[in-house]
Amino acid sequence: MAGPTTAERGDRQQESSGPPPARWSGTRRLRALVVLAALLVLLAGGCAWLLYGSSWLRLERVSVSGTRMLTPADVREAASVPVGAPLVSVDTEAVEARLRRKLPRIDTVDVVRSWPHGIGLKVTERTPVLLVRKAGTFVEVDDDGVRFATVSQAPKGVPVLELTASRSGSGAASFRRFGTDRLVREAVRVGGDLPAAVARQTRTVKVGSYDDISLELGDGRSVAWGSGEDGRAKARALTALMKAVPGARHFDVSVPTAPASSGS
């Protein structure tokens, strides 16, 4: 039986001399992965340099909006935002906490990055709804009962709170049970429930105890409100009573189902 010819042996040698197809394919995939990984590393490094190392994305300006009593300069100083630092490195939560701590007049603040070079501080200030006299000045109280600022002059249209209860006598029980802060919050609660027309005329809110809150209006009339409970019902009763007896000088809605008036 004849063996393979010289040509046939040569063909077989050529076929077996190259790498196996599967091995060649695996090598190409490995090279592609290495190249891809290198590109990703370069891309990540470039992004990191752009954000932290370059001068293109650094903080250059701090804008302030929403101020009323505060000035933009007050807010910028309290914020202490590091101008010149990489914008991405600014800790917006820390800036917000710093502003709220240093400026109690601020109720809320939004700190936002304004690419490529800015930080925006959007401020909402607290609004006083009551004033508490203190050593010739006035402490402003907001609608949450927070005492947030002291001013030398009373803001126009904001009633003064008078805590007429004493720590002894008839008001002592309220002080022991509720404390001053709770009584202040009850006064704020009453102020929030007042009919708009009455709220505009209110000059003084007197708190004798938890259930003895009264109002003095600018025209000399007075209102016995009682506690801060049932505020909406009391507001409706007061509105109706003032319309029914416009000449009265004193109104009592402490029991809203049985309002009363007196004086003329």
UniProtKB/Swiss-Prot annotation:
GO terms for biological process: cell septum assembly; FtsZ-dependent cytokinesis. Keywords: Cell cycle, Cell division, Cell membrane, Membrane, Transmembrane, Transmembrane helix. It is found in: Cell membrane. It comes from the Bacteria. GO terms for cellular component: cell division site; plasma membrane. It is a single-pass type II membrane protein. Residues 1-31 are cytoplasmic. Residues 57-126 form the POTRA domain. The gene is ftsQ. This is Cell division protein FtsQ. Residues 53-264 are extracellular. Belongs to the FtsQ/DivIB family. FtsQ subfamily. The keyword Nucleotide-binding does not apply. Residues 1-24 are annotated as: Disordered.
